[in-house]
């Protein structure tokens, strides 16, 4: 039998065997591939016979060998796809799916209490016509201090021990720089400026039950014509009553902040004893909750705002402070320790 006839028979017989392959024949398919196309396979053995052919026949037979190899390689690849598909279908046919079985329970997280407090406060201010403005946590000394009426070497800078990155770059100690930047750009011909600037701030404090090197503030600013201390008091009363209950009262005590004049500390009537005096309010009936005041004329002037024509008020409150008072939390570190047992209380 000549070599060409043997090649044709090998191709025909192999194709016939491949046509019979089913899903359970994956092992047989691999064995057949090795037996036909492997290094010691039938096609390789036939190829060795080329050397015995006359020189004029070798090109023709060599071409036929390559064609048979290509045809069988493609046939094996197609057969492998058929076998794999049949195997998958057989597996699907043998399995049943009970759609009435309950699914796997997934433990879902919840919003952190500080995020809940921030969103609640933001919603209150949005309802009062304020805008929310975000700013940079890494700030310049100029905007963090000088624009807040705290020039270099001002003694009040000691009140805010600061993380400096360079002599002029720092981690902001309050969100007031956002107010200064917004004040620079505001067009008062379109109306007064009413904004809050929530965010994280940093102080070089030693962490303990009441202090943290990072915490969250929400500072507010209103600037327009004829803004008075009465406007400030009315705004703060509305905020406090929405946060702590309509029966809450506030009182203003004189204080000092470089960027407001006059400045006040704001107290709220104790929500545990109703102002009668208890351990929470240290028998005074009042709890200190935030600082505020009328915007210092110098702060307005540095933004190019005429302090003779415009006035304003500013205030700042801490999210941690609000949460601790509302929920009786006595350690600020609880907010940052990631204890699931703590977080689950505020779902």
Curated annotation (Swiss-Prot):
Record flagged with keyword Hydrolase: no
Instruction: Copy out the cofactor comment.
Output: Binds 2 magnesium ions per tetramer.
Q: Where in the cell is it found?
A: Cytoplasm
Q: Can you state which reaction this protein catalyses?
A: tRNA(Phe) + L-phenylalanine + ATP = L-phenylalanyl-tRNA(Phe) + AMP + diphosphate + H(+)
Which keywords does this chain's UniProt record carry? Aminoacyl-tRNA synthetase, ATP-binding, Cytoplasm, Ligase, Magnesium, Metal-binding, Nucleotide-binding, Protein biosynthesis
- Similarity field: Belongs to the class-II aminoacyl-tRNA synthetase family. Phe-tRNA synthetase alpha subunit type 1 subfamily.
Q: What is this protein called?
A: Phenylalanine--tRNA ligase alpha subunit
